A protein has these predicted regions:
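Short, surface-exposed ligand-recognition loops at beta-strand->loop->(often short) alpha-helix junctions
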Residues: 10-22
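Intrinsically disordered, low-complexity segments enriched in polar/charged residues with Gly/Pro
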Residues: 15-17, 27-29, 41-43
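Short, well-ordered beta-strand segments in beta-rich or mixed alpha/beta enzyme
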Residues: 2-10, 38-71, 108
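An amphipathic, aromatic/His-enriched active-site/gating alpha helix that lines ligand/cofactor pockets
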Residues: 25-37, 56-93
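Non-catalytic surface loops within mature trypsin-like serine protease
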Residues: 11-13, 59, 95-98
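Glycine-rich beta-strand-turn "strand-cap" elements at beta-sheet edges
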Residues: 38-50, 76-110
Length: 110
């Protein structure tokens, strides 16, 4: 079973564009690590500084190792992500069937 990490957070005022760039750099680094299957970040369409960040890992072990690599490499550059947030993030970790989950993203020819 794969592990899906879902984070919903909001940024402080006037740093939302920078925060999204930093989130995207985190997700890009995650995608390059062994054990990360998918990673993306998105900003709310209603203009609010609300963000959705999701990462799919092969296992709990990969979640821990990839998260450690990302924080060690990127936090020294810009500080911890929490320093950009207006409050604590809502974080959920879900166990999903890897094949079924990834199949949802395959386009079917009609």
């Amino acid at each position: 079973m794969a592990w899906l990490e879902t984070v919903v957070c909001s940024s402080q005022k006037k740093v939302d564009a920078r925060f999204l760039r930093i989130l995207n750099s985190h997700q890009e680094l995650k995608r390059r690590q062994e054990g990360c299957l998918l990673a993306w970040a998105a900003k709310s369409v209603d203009g609010q500084p609300l963000f959705l960040v999701q990462t799919l890992y092969k296992s709990r072990k990969h979640l821990k190792s990839v998260s450690k690599i990302v924080s060690e490499k990127l936090d020294p550059e810009h500080g911890p992500l929490e320093s950009f947030m207006s409050g604590p993030p809502l974080v959920g970790i879900f166990e999903v069937d890897e094949v079924q989950f990834l199949d949802q993203f395959k386009s079917s020819e009609k």
